[in-house]
Structure formats: C-alpha cells, structure tokens
Amino acid sequence: MLKYDVIVIGGGHAGVEAAAASARLGVPTLLITLKPENLGEMSCNPAIGGIAKGTLVKEIDALDGLMGYVIDQAGIHYKMLNETRGPAVWGPRAQADRKLYKKAMYQILTNYPNLDILYGKVEDIEIKSSKIEAVILNNGSKILCQKIILTTGTFLSGLIHIGQKKIPAGRVDEEPSYGLSNTLKQIGFKLARLKTGTPPRIDGRTIDYSKTILQPGDKIPRPFSELTNIVNVSQINCFITKTTSETHDIIRENLDKSAMYSGQIEGIGPRYCPSIEDKIVRFSTKSEHRIFLEPEGLDDYTIYPNGISTSLPEDVQHKLIKTIPGLENVKVLRPGYAIEYDYVDPREISVTLETKKIAGLYLAGQINGTTGYEEAAGQGIIAGINAALAVKDQAPFMLTRANSYIGVMIDDLTTFGTIEPYRMFTSRSEYRLSLRADNSDLRLTELGMNIGVVSEKRKKIFTKKCEDIEKIKSLLNTLSLTTSKLAKMGIQVAQDGTYKTVLDLFKIPNFNVEQAIKIFPMLKETQNKNILQLLYIEAKYASYLTRQHADINLFQSEEAQFIPKNIDYFKIPSISLEIQEKLSSHKPTTIGVARRIPGITPAAITAIIIYLKTKYSDGSST
C-alpha cells in the first residue's frame, strides 16, 4: 500500500504551492489532481497580481514559492498599478499566456524533488481518533498518510449556472466532488455556499480595435521573482472598451433570466468583483462600465473581456456583447457562467491552517472562503510548510499582520470568518506602508531560511542583495553637495550652508531616483535601480515608518501574550455575559487576537490580562 507523509488534494494555485513547500522541506509528498496537465490552471482571468494581490505574490516568492517565478516565464503584459499614488498601494500585475503558465508549472512540478503527482479523484478521507489516516480514491484504493491538505477550489459540490441551465462541475468540463463535501459534513464542519463567475470568451480576430482604447504595458517589465533577472517573454497590448445604455437596457430586461436574480443561486458572490448584472443593479446611475480586453496568449486569439462576468442565458450574452463598442461583430467562443461551491467556515482552522477538529487536516484556498489565485497560493504555501513541519515534529510557521499580507489574510479569516468571497486589499492591512511589494523578501526570506523552506540558490541571491543594500546605502550617505550648489541646480532646499547627502535629498518633495542619478552619475554603476527605489522609499517615508514600527512593536507584544486553551471566560466576573460567550466561541489564542474580535471592549481586554496574571502567574498555560 502506498504511503506518503503529506498528501495534497487538488492541483490549483493553493495545491501546487502546498505540495512544493512540503517537498522543499524534505517531506515525501503526493499531489493528487484530476488532470496533471492542468496544474496551476487559470480558471478565470489569465493574470497574476494586482493591488494587494501583487504583494501576496511577492511574499510567496520570498518563501521560495512558485507563482512569481512561473508568471515571469509566461507574463505577456506587465503593469504596475497605482504607480502615481504612494508605494504602500502599488500593485504589480502581469497578464499571462495561459498555455505558457501551465506548461512552466507542469515542468517545474514534475521534476520537483520529494514530490510525486497522481492522476485521480479522492472520494473520502479515513480518520481514526480524530487523526488523519489515509485518503480513499474513487477506484477504492487507499493511500496512507500523516497529513492531508485540502485545496479543492470550486469543486466541492460545484454547480455551474448559465441562465436557467445547471451543470454539475468544478469548472468547465471537469466533474465536481461530492464525496469530500459529504466527508466534511460527516466530520461536523460547517459548510456553506459561495458563488463566483467568469465572463464569456470572445474571438480577438473579430474585434474592431479602432473603437477601443489602447492599454500598453510597462516599457520595461518588472519581474515578480527575485530569481528572475529579465522577463524574456514577448509583450503585447491590452485594450479598453465600455458598456453602453443599450447594454444596460438588455441586462435590465433579462434580469429575471439571470441565475443570480432568479433565485436559482443560493451562494453569495464576491462583493468587489461583481457580475455585470450586479453592476447594473447596484450602480444604476452609472451610464457605462469599463471592460478590459485581455489576450489569453501570444498564439491564442481568445480574449478575456474583464468586467462582464455573467450568468445570463447564452442568447442574452450574445445580444449584450454586440452593443459594446468594438464588439458589434464579435464571435463568442464560450459563454460566461456563475459557479456555486461549498466552503468551510474558516474559523474552523487555526493560523497554521490546520483544522481544529481533525489533527493533520489542513485547508487552503477557496475552501476557506477566499477568492483569487494569489489568496489561494498564499494559503497553500503556509499549509504546505506547516504540514511538513508537523511531520518533522518542528514548531509551526506562523505569519502575522505585522509582517505580511498573508498574515493579515489568515488572521482575518480565522478571527472573523467570512460570509462572502474574501479578497485581499491594501486597506485590510494597518501596516501597509511597512508591508510593501518591494520589501517582501527583506521581511520574509530570512524567516523561510530559518525553517529550511528556501533553496540554496535563493539564499545566495538574498544574501547578495542584502550586501548590496548596505553598500548602496553607504554610498548614498557619502555622496553629498552643499545647499548652494543644489540651489543652482534648481533644487529647493534651506540655504543653511550644510551638505546634503542623497538620502537627505530623497526626503525633499518631488525629488526622485532619476534626479539623484542625474546629479550623481556614479549611481548608474550600482546596476540595481530596485535597491535605489527601495532606499528612496525608506528615506522618504522614514518618519511614518518609525511611527508604524512602534505600532508594530505594540502589536507584537500583545501577540506574545498567549491565552491558555483551558481558560474559562465565565469565571472572569468583570466582563459581560455577551463578551464571555463571544470569547468562548472564538477561543482567541492571544490577547492581540482577542482585541480584534468585534464587540470585545478595551475594558474586557484589561480584565482578561489581569485575570491571566492572577490565575496563571505560575506560568501554567495549557
């Protein structure tokens, strides 16, 4: 009988990261997927990154994950979103060649040490004494294991809706999983339904691009991965068009035929990625909505019209598309659809992503109520790391709100749960100026090195970068000019007769890296503009970052105040029954987590701290 230490069920974005992370830690790992050729399949939009999402990708890369490196092998349109705003909200994004992305992912995983890939379908999980024993395949065979990571995406009782038509599926042409849904229910997990959707795909050869707006990418693509020096994939343009009043009229006239508005769909859809029906209803005063025409590949004429996700009947989809400028004669290749699926209340898992009910069972991705490739991948890598560390009897690896967007996401999910698809935003992070995309490796790679999940190649690159940062920082502190010379160059500084270093100049409004290179040409020789940009940001926002670091220190002190598992909140007389019930239900692990539970007052937190000091002053906390 086959036996593995860790088995990952599902080969989507969460699954591939989980399997690779577990394998990197030297643990024999099996990835079970319906179609190995679809590893890392982009079920919806063929793009990686975006605002907040791009930071997640950089954090995954910092821990030696796959997503950033793979998109650099397949990215055909790179663009830094929000670049005209502050660096805390910059969002690296890349449109992908769908085929190249899957090909690169397949090549990496099929040659990954300690990782086997099995074509198959898991029907059940064998559990004994609340511990994982094995997985059972649909052919009746059993594979023994210590840990299981469930990354089922939209496959748990998945149901596609196109108008009134219902199609049981995990995605187009792939059957859903009912067995695992039943298993989770039998274990006692709280399952609910969520919904997501995708737009129709159209033939780019039938688009009149003269009626659209050109959207070029960045002139020089900025790679996601620290392992990538230059993006060598050909770059192409995207285009923008918009809906019209006629489009809106057709949608309004047919709302009763939409699966969303006919009452056919029970699941709640993503608030921040609404269907075109939702947009017309919720934003009824808007006369138009933008649509981004995004190519799906270099040698693929399929276009993804980002912005018109729909569950309307096929004939209505055809009608509304032809009212859009440039799409009057377009050929529809595949209809859009909505898909419903089961998910588990994420408050049923801990911050390691292990379930509280079953030891050795981990959940990652859409099964936890999230939406998006990047959110799934971020959970996958943490689940994979922790499953492998548990096999090795090592301490768990936990990211926090203070050091990563991944930590913010996991804390949000495990503390508050979610009743709608959870998407990451910069606004969810209270420390976003410190948690930027450009410093992800400086925040996380050393943590990854400490637990052994980072390769030797990445270690060398990271070590070299840290050395370069110190050298360039020293140079910036050395290069200087008098205020009078700077004034002659048109740079407005106080004429106090002092010398100003480059780091001083970075703090001046409207002064940037390009100006510094112009004044001090030797900075060109640093050969790393990314480091200059990093040091520029750190200098420019130094006072804000100092204050934020003080806030982070306070946060970390509260996170270090652990709450014993056996605490009885009903024995703390100075807090209300309502708060006692909330705390008993949530079971916060630290004072910091307790403070973030809605409705928990500062007075209650003080009461808990005092109680812990008196009750557990001998250090006993089990």
From Swiss-Prot:
InterPro entries: FAD/NAD-bd_sf, GIDA_C_N, MnmG, MnmG-rel, MnmG-rel_CS, MnmG_C, MnmG_C_subdom, MnmG_C_subdom_sf
Gene3D superfamilies linked: FAD/NAD(P)-binding domain, GidA associated domain, C-terminal subdomain
Cofactor(s) this protein requires: FAD
Major place of residence: cytoplasm
Residues binding FAD, per UniProt: 10-15, 122, 177, 366
Subcellular location: Cytoplasm
GO MF terms, alphabetically ordered: flavin adenine dinucleotide binding
Gene Ontology BP terms: tRNA methylation; tRNA wobble uridine modification
Taxonomic superkingdom: Bacteria
Cited Pfam families: GIDA (PF01134), GIDA_C_1st (PF21680), SAM_GIDA_C (PF13932)
GO cellular component: cytosol
Record: residues binding NAD(+): 269-283
Keywords, comma-separated and alphabetical: Cytoplasm, FAD, Flavoprotein, NAD, tRNA processing
Transmembrane regions listed in the UniProt entry: none
Complex and partners: Homodimer. Heterotetramer of two MnmE and two MnmG subunits.
Similarity remark: Belongs to the MnmG family.
Entry function: NAD-binding protein involved in the addition of a carboxymethylaminomethyl (cmnm) group at the wobble position (U34) of certain tRNAs, forming tRNA-cmnm(5)s(2)U34.
Protein name per Swiss-Prot or TrEMBL: tRNA uridine 5-carboxymethylaminomethyl modification enzyme MnmG
Species this chain originates from: Rickettsia africae (strain ESF-5)
Source organism phylogeny: Bacteria, Pseudomonadati, Pseudomonadota, Alphaproteobacteria, Rickettsiales
